[in-house]
């Protein structure tokens, strides 16, 4: 039944039935742990890979000995980096030793290897002032994979791929004639016997002896035209290096460098682990019948007798006795099974070698060699340490290749298993640390080339490590990764949940991953191995569906990059669930039967029911209670954090739950956050781990609290901890980040307690929206198509008001004609426009600005023109002041307004780092309060989204019997077809809880049942169906039917109408077509497209159509003349020829086609090449520079075009600002606008 639980400072009444056994791990540990690993181990591995660098003679040797990150030399703190557009980084220093073999001279130096970006405590990076997140990548794990195709006759043709981390692939395939082929590194296929011969088994007899007499192998040997090792080597060389003269030596060295050279072929630790797991002999021996006695080579005992079935224990014993080949009886055939000769080192060494950190199996021949030659512990340990790379080779070895071939040969006899590449046991995570390591490796290998070149060129006497090493390639590789990699993303900072989700995101895209176009349905689909590891719900809609996923709540990533999930162990003898918790990867879990977390237990933890429902791979089956191996730790372990925040998720349709999870991430932080009445209990954990809340570092007592700072007196040593709070900072998405304290002076706090609320949090719980009193009722059609009818009270009381902060910057540069200047002295600007500008020329903080207001006054030198006599006189009298400058001030863009909350000025004089050519940089921050308005998008947590259609006066809204009006009316038709019934249960529970003053926690799959809600409704004094009589606010009459009413948690999403609506009369035009640009950012127009033209044609509205396609679009002369005619009140003149038509003619002429335009009477119509002359006469400049009006042509002889000059009466232009070609190219992102390129935009 319902019971109280304490979450932070708030008590919630919880409906959970299952007590949580396992605490949720830190939700951003994926990021933090991976980055830590990089500094502790990852970087070391890279240096080990390149050590030592030798010159071509082998005389000079360069070694990297040690490295350290100088955290004391960090230039700016995180906050300063954001302010100054800097990167939060620390210098990496590497100790380098140079050895000259001839002279025996050794030089050691510490070399600076560039600034390395540091991760903040929140798991983000600050790159060039912007917070970025490195998303983890899901990739195929290196290993050996087996599959099959079916040919026309229904016969299974087995194939296999051996995939390294980097290096040449080996692919085996069988054709319908039972011949096995191999492809080496994607080249043409060869019979597999050629590869076997080349690896050392030259003759047919040797091959058959080694692999056993197998039909397909014999057929392959017959097909093979080589008979010796030498012939095979030459054959392979011809295939891999066509056109080069083949020799046996070059063929040998080619194979060695392709497969057995650690620099060219890298399996990585994961690959070695997967190889040993797949190719180990014991897995294939399970449940097979031995064809002969298997004898322990050390003791001579018989492990398995002929004809005996091999069980798990016997199979393991065979493996641990280093027996690498066993004959198996399959019906009437004898099949030889060969392993890859790797063993568990602890079975052969009886003393402690834990300090060597050997977790993988080791290569037995190498180990045997050491054990045969040494006997005492110390020297064995030394040798193992020395030969660690031979014991655990990072490249493939001949034994591995033989084992992969043996596996392929055994598959038709059901020895071995087929792999599923979408199984999470075969997909792993590359997190920040590994991605960084790969980048660093690329940089270092480029640097290695430079070092080798310099070694040969420079004088060997005076050479130093510093002179050899060029850090450019390393620094460039790292910079490129953080700046432009697909996996380095601009952090989604809309609210704390979106931050958290972004850090826990898993992407299958990116370098070395899949591409959207190639990814099929299987990769995207939910797989049974996702259970407890990846969320089956949260993924984007659209082309990325299933390729971008989210980590489940309890999931962890192990050292190999596989995702693990926790389970409780079951004691099978007593059928008792213990409190012991194990973390399992997907392929380990496959061997067990797992019960669900809600399975009822008695007080001793034993199963109550005799029959238990369990998961077995993708099936759900019922077994007796003594067969269960494991039990889930929590019902919410299968979903991600965002999905776990949806109450009654179990009553929602999956596709709507997906929308609900995604839309919570788009909720805008509101002015007064309110935690949900009906929550799930995970809100606190999510907010605390997201990193937006300041937490106490130590136990202590609050000594001082203000709106900007909290100070804590530590209990341990009496010292003082100071926590600065963020005030009105702009997030990446333009929402407002503001923290306010929730502790008071004298309060005792424990380490980890929340000190202040941030954006969208309420008492340390995530609070994305508001609890709104609503009813499912239609109202005058304003609910059509999911629209929402809202009460004016939401506007008046600022319930859905949010603060948005925009940043505008202006820089004063050096131009060819002189430096730009930031000043208050702007030409042709009245004093009225400068009322908020200070003496420096910058707007004052606190000023209210509207669109078009000046933020930063700036003037740019103009080209010197021929001066008239009067001007020369003025120059002579007043000096330089009368020089030509142009007003290029920063103004508030169209449709923006607000209050200046901050201004930052960076100058060269103050020692700020500015880009080259920039002397001064000014940034203004404008904050605006956005109240809820018609057209804003709102949503619940169950995927029920809609747009506000009307804001109704409070007195007209439907009201309850006690007189309280509803705040929102939703359409009841939105529920049944969408099957998200969770929202109805939320409304009922919220109605009861709201009345009783409770906050509720109803965890997913573990929450309130229908009868519990009914009980609570009765307790609160409401009808048990949750419905009530509603009265019409306009007439006071009751509605015909009773209506479901209650409290629903509603979010305001980031799709605000203010950001989307805009209006244009005239504005910038595209340079080529002279048509208006498109989109709000370019201040564009509405495109009158193909279909709209058809519509006007269908109506026969010829003149309207002509006008739309000419003077309203790209008839340059006609545009101006029409404007004139409107201004002077005359009739609109005839349209001219559209510019796009001229462009079309030019394009046809570019194809060498002679195009003429003919009239009805077949006479050629001359189309003027350029309308520049007309334009100049009209006083319009079509080049699209910033000067809107060209001065009327005074330099011409007066008789030339008298009437053209008469057209333009200068005085009339004083008050009309023509904006035809206001196209300031430098202000558009890429110069020409997007329509000019056939891009995907």
Swiss-Prot record:
The gene is rpoB. It catalyses: RNA(n) + a ribonucleoside 5'-triphosphate = RNA(n+1) + diphosphate. The lineage of its organism: Bacteria, Bacillati, Bacillota, Clostridia, Eubacteriales. This is DNA-directed RNA polymerase subunit beta. Residues 1200-1210 have a biased composition (Acidic residues). Transmembrane segments: none annotated. Gene3D superfamilies: 2.40.50.100, 2.40.50.150, 3.90.1100.10, DNA-directed RNA polymerase, beta subunit, external 1 domain (2.30.150.10), DNA-directed RNA polymerase, subunit 2, domain 6 (2.40.270.10), RNA polymerase alpha subunit dimerisation domain (3.90.1800.10), RNA polymerase Rpb2, domain 2 (3.90.1110.10). Pfam families: RNA_pol_Rpb2_1 (PF04563), RNA_pol_Rpb2_2 (PF04561), RNA_pol_Rpb2_3 (PF04565), RNA_pol_Rpb2_45 (PF10385), RNA_pol_Rpb2_6 (PF00562), RNA_pol_Rpb2_7 (PF04560). PROSITE patterns: RNA_POL_BETA (PS01166). It is an enzyme of class 2 (transferase). Its EC number is 2.7.7.6. Belongs to the RNA polymerase beta chain family. Keywords: DNA-directed RNA polymerase, Nucleotidyltransferase, Transcription, Transferase. One of its GO terms (molecular function) is DNA binding. CDD domains: RNA_pol_B_RPB2. InterPro entries: DNA-dir_RNA_pol_bsu_ext_1_sf, DNA-dir_RNA_pol_bsu_external_1, DNA-dir_RNA_pol_su2, DNA-dir_RNAP_su2_dom, DNA-dir_RNAP_su2_hyb_sf, RNA_pol_bsu_bac, RNA_pol_bsu_CS, RNA_pol_bsu_protrusion. It comes from the Bacteria. Residues 1186-1210 are annotated as: Disordered. The RNAP catalytic core consists of 2 alpha, 1 beta, 1 beta' and 1 omega subunit. When a sigma factor is associated with the core the holoenzyme is formed, which can initiate transcription. The keyword 4Fe-4S does not apply. One of its GO terms (biological process) is DNA-templated transcription. DNA-dependent RNA polymerase catalyzes the transcription of DNA into RNA using the four ribonucleoside triphosphates as substrates. GO terms for cellular component: DNA-directed RNA polymerase complex.
């Amino acid at each position: 039944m319902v019971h109280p639980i304490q979450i932070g400072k708030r008590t919630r009444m919880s409906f959970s039935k299952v007590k949580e056994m396992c605490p949720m791990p830190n939700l951003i540990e994926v990021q933090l742990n991976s980055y830590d690993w990089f500094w502790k181990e990852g970087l070391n591995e890279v240096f080990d890979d390149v050590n030592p660098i030798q010159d071509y003679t082998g005389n000079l040797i360069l070694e990297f000995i040690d490295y350290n990150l100088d955290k004391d030399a960090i230039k700016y703190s995180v906050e300063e980096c954001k302010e100054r557009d800097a990167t939060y980084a620390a210098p990496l220093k590497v100790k380098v030793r140079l050895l000259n073999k001839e002279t025996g001279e050794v030089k050691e130096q510490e070399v600076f290897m560039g600034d390395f970006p540091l991760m903040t405590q929140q798991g983000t990076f600050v790159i060039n002032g912007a917070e970025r997140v490195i998303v983890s990548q899901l990739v195929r794990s290196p290993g050996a994979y087996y599959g099959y195709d079916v040919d026309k006759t229904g016969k299974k043709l087995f194939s296999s791929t051996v995939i390294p981390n980097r290096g040449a692939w080996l692919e085996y395939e069988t054709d319908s004639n039972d011949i096995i082929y191999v492809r080496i590194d994607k080249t043409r296929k060869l019979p597999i016997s050629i590869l076997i011969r080349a690896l050392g088994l030259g003759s047919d007899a040797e091959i058959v002896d080694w692999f056993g007499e197998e039909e397909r192998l014999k057929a392959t040997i017959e097909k093979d035209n080589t008979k010796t090792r030498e012939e095979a080597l030459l054959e392979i060389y011809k295939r891999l290096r066509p056109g080069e003269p083949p020799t046996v030596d070059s063929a040998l060295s080619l194979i060695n460098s392709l497969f057995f050279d650690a620099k060219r072929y890298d399996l990585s630790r994961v690959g070695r682990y997967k190889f040993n797991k797949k190719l180990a002999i014991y897995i294939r021996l399970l449940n097979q019948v031995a064809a002969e006695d298997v004898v322990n080579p050390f003791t001579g005992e018989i492990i398995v007798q002929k004809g005996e079935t091999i069980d798990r224990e016997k199979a393991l014993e065979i493996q641990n006795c280093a027996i690498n080949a066993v004959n198996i009886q399959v019906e009437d055939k004898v099949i030889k099974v060969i392993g890859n000769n790797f063993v568990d080192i602890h079975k052969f060494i009886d003393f402690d070698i834990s300090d060597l950190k050997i977790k993988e199996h080791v290569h037995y021949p190498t180990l045997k060699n050491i054990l045969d030659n040494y006997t005492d512990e110390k020297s064995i340990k030394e040798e193992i340490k020395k030969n660690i790379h031979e014991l655990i080779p990072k490249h493939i070895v001949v034994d591995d290749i033989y084992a992969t071939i043996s596996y392929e040969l055994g598959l038709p006899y059901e020895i071995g298993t087929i792999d599923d590449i979408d199984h999470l046991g075969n997909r792993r995570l590359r997190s920040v640390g590994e991605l960084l390591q790969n980048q660093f490796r690329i940089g270092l290998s480029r640097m290695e080339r430079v070092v080798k070149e310099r070694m040969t060129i420079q004088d060997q006497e005076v050479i130093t490590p510093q002179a050899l090493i060029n850090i450019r390639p390393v620094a460039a590789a790292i910079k490129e990764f953080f700046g432009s990699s697909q996996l380095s993303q601009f952090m989604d900072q809309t609210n704390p949940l979106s931050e958290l989700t972004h850090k826990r995101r898993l992407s299958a895209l990116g370098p070395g991953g899949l591409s959207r176009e190639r990814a099929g349905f299987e990769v995207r689909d939910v797989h049974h191995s996702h259970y407890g590891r990846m969320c089956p719900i949260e993924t984007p809609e659209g082309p990325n569906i299933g390729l971008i996923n989210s980590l489940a709540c309890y999931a962890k990533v192990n050292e190999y990059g596989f995702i693990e999930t926790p389970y409780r162990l079951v004691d099978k003898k007593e059928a008792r669930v213990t409190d012991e918790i194990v973390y399992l990867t997907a392929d380990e879990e496959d061997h067990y039967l797992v019960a669900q977390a809600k399975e009822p237990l008695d007080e001793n933890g034993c199963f109550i029911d005799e029959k238990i429902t369990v998961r077995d791979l993708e099936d759900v089956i019922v077994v007796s209670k003594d067969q269960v191996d494991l039990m889930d730790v929590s019902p919410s372990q299968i979903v991600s954090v965002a999905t776990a925040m949806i109450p009654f998720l179990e009553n929602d349709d999956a596709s709507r739950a997906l929308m609900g999870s995604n839309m919570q991430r788009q909720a805008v932080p509101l002015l007064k956050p309110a935690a949900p009445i009906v929550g799930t209990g995970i809100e606190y954990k999510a907010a605390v781990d997201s990193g937006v809340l300041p937490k106490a570092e130590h136990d202590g007592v609050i000594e001082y609290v203000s709106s900007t700072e909290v100070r804590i007196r530590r209990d341990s040593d009496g010292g003082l901890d100071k926590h600065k709070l963020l005030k009105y900072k702009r997030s990446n998405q333009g929402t407002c980040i503001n923290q306010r304290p929730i502790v008071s002076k004298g309060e005792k706090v424990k380490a980890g307690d929340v000190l202040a609320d941030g954006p969208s949090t309420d008492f340390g719980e995530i609070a994305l929206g508001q609890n709104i009193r609503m009813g499912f009722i239609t109202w005058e059609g304003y609910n059509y198509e999911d629209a929402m009818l809202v009460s004016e009270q939401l506007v008046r009381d600022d319930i859905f008001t949010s603060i948005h902060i925009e940043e505008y910057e202006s820089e004063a540069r050096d131009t060819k004609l002189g430096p730009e200047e930031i000043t208050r002295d702007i030409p042709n600007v009245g004093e009225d426009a400068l009322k908020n500008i200070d003496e420096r020329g910058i707007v004052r903080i606190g000023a209210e600005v509207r669109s078009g207001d000046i933020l930063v006054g700036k003037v740019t030198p103009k080209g010197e023109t021929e001066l008239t006599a009067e001007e020369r006189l003025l120059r002579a009298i007043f000096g330089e002041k009368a020089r030509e400058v142009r007003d290029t001030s920063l103004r508030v863009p169209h449709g923006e307004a607000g209050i200046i909350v901050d201004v930052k000025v960076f100058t060269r004089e103050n020692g700020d780092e500015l880009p080259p050519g920039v002397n001064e940089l000014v940034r203004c921050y404008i904050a605006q309060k956005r109240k809820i308005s018609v057209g804003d998008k709102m949503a619940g947590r169950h995927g029920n989204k809609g747009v506000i259609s009307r804001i109704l006066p409070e007195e007209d809204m439907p009201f309850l019997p006690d007189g309280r009006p509803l705040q929102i009316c939703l359409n009841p038709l939105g529920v049944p077809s969408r099957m998200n019934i969770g929202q109805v249960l939320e409304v009922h529970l919220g109605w009861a809880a709201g009345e009783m003053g409770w906050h509720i926690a109803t965890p997913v799959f573990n929450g309130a049942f229908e009868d519990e809600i009914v009980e609570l409704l009765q307790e609160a004094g409401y009808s048990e169906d949750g419905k009530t009589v509603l009265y019409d606010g306009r007439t006071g009459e009751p509605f015909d039917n009773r209506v479901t009413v209650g409290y629903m948690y509603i979010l305001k999403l980031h799709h605000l109408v203010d950001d989307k609506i805009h209006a244009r009369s005239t504005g910038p035009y595209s340079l080529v077509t002279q048509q208006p640009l498109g989109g709000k950012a370019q201040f564009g127009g509405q495109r009158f497209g193909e279909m709209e033209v058809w519509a006007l044609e269908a109506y026969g509205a010829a003149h309207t159509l002509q006008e739309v396609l000419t003077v309203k679009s790209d008839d340059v002369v006609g545009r101006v003349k029409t404007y004139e005619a409107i201004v002077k009140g005359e009739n609109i003149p005839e349209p001219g020829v559209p510019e796009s038509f001229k462009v079309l003619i030019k394009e046809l002429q570019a194809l060498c086609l002679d195009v003429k335009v003919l009239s009805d009477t077949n006479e050629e119509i001359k189309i003027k090449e350029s309308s520049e002359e007309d334009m100049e006469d009209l006083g319009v400049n079509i080049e699209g520079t910033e000067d809107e009006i060209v001065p009327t042509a005074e330099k011409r002889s007066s008789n030339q075009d008298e009437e053209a000059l008469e057209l333009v009466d200068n005085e009339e232009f004083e008050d009309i600002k023509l904006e035809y070609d206001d196209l300031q190219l430098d202000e558009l992102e890429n110069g020409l606008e997007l329509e000019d390129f056939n891009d995907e935009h």
